[in-house]
């Protein structure tokens, strides 16, 4: 875990210069790499992207039940886990959002900040680095959860901190790694940890200007119990107009970071996998003003 904190420290030290450079973009000829990914998520995982300046993005993440029962429940479509979120791009480097997930009735607020940006020209930098911070609150009724929820409000809180480090290698291929630390205030047994570290990998390969194949995968960096499954998702993107439509197959049903990283329970060998989709719509508030905030 110490390596994750070291990576955070290094990125913050470099990002001070990068953010100052952004304020002076007009003074130098710097070409920043664009569209490493089509949307703000790869499949389950966050991507390097944020909404464009003065753009509000609305995203629906819909995950069906397990496909293992086949036509009996139409491959899980009788059941669903859903997440909605809004995120707003204030400028080229900062976005703020809020969402709600049906799993554990979690409401959350999140920030995405571009600390470093891949660029060429006068300033040549090989990677992009984005910091993702999220705080969530479980709002289950007390009867639905452990009695400890009613003892203290803070027991309902979750904290997610993630670095997204990636590179667009060419017009078709983009890859990223996601060192992640999740802190949960409430654990159910003495053997469970409050703080959980994991490492994610994600990529995109563009087939056409509108269509791409995506995948993400997470592994733990410390011990988990025997029920833990490494989370994965594989799918495709299709962009049309202001919409990005993503379809995926995953071993995790919950679309929120904590649920798909730490609570994936699917097993390909038994057919316990979950079909899902993301759809996002962008709303621009730029009007006739070409100046960014």
List the predicted regions and their residue ranges:
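Bacterial Sec-dependent N-terminal signal peptides
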Residues: 1-19
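Alpha-helical protein-protein interaction elements
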Residues: 4-6, 29, 209
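Small side chains
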Residues: 7-9, 166, 203
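Transmembrane beta-barrel domains of Gram-negative outer membranes and organellar outer membranes
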Residues: 16-150, 157-161, 166-177, 181-185, ...
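Low-complexity, polar/charged sequence tracts that form flexible coils or short amphipathic helices
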Residues: 156, 195, 206, 226-227
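A mid-sequence, solvent-exposed acidic-amphipathic segment
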Residues: 172-173, 177-218
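Substrate-binding/catalytic groove segments of enzymes
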Residues: 208-214, 225, 242-246
């Amino acid at each position: 875990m110490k390596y994750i904190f070291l990576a955070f420290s290094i990125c913050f030290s470099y990002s001070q210069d990068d953010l100052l450079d952004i304020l002076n973009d007009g003074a130098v000829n710097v070409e920043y790499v664009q569209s490493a990914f089509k949307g703000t998520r790869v499949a389950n995982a966050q991507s390097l992207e944020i909404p464009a300046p003065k753009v509000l993005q609305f995203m629906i993440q819909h995950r069906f039940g397990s496909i293992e029962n086949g036509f009996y429940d139409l491959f899980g479509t009788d059941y669903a886990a859903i997440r909605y979120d809004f995120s707003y791009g204030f400028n080229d480097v900062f976005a703020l959002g809020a969402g709600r997930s049906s799993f554990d009735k979690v409401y959350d607020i999140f920030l995405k900040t571009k600390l470093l940006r891949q660029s060429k020209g006068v300033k040549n930098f090989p990677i992009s680095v984005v910091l993702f911070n999220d705080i969530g609150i479980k709002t289950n009724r007390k009867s639905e959860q452990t009695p400890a929820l009613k003892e203290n409000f803070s027991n309902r809180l979750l904290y997610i901190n993630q670095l997204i480090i990636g590179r667009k290698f060419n017009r078709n291929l983009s890859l990223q790694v996601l060192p992640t630390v999740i802190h949960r205030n409430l654990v159910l047994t003495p053997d469970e940890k409050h703080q959980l570290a994991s490492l994610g990998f994600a990529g995109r390969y563009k087939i056409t200007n509108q269509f791409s194949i995506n995948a993400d995968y997470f592994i733990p960096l410390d011990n988990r119990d025997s029920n833990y499954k490494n989370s994965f998702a594989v799918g495709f993107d299709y962009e049309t107009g202001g919409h990005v439509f993503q379809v995926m197959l995953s071993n995790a049903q919950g679309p929120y970071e904590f649920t798909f990283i730490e609570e994936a329970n699917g097993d390909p060998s038994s057919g316990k996998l979950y079909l899902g989709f993301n759809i996002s719509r962008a709303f621009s508030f730029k009007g006739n003003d070409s100046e960014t905030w």
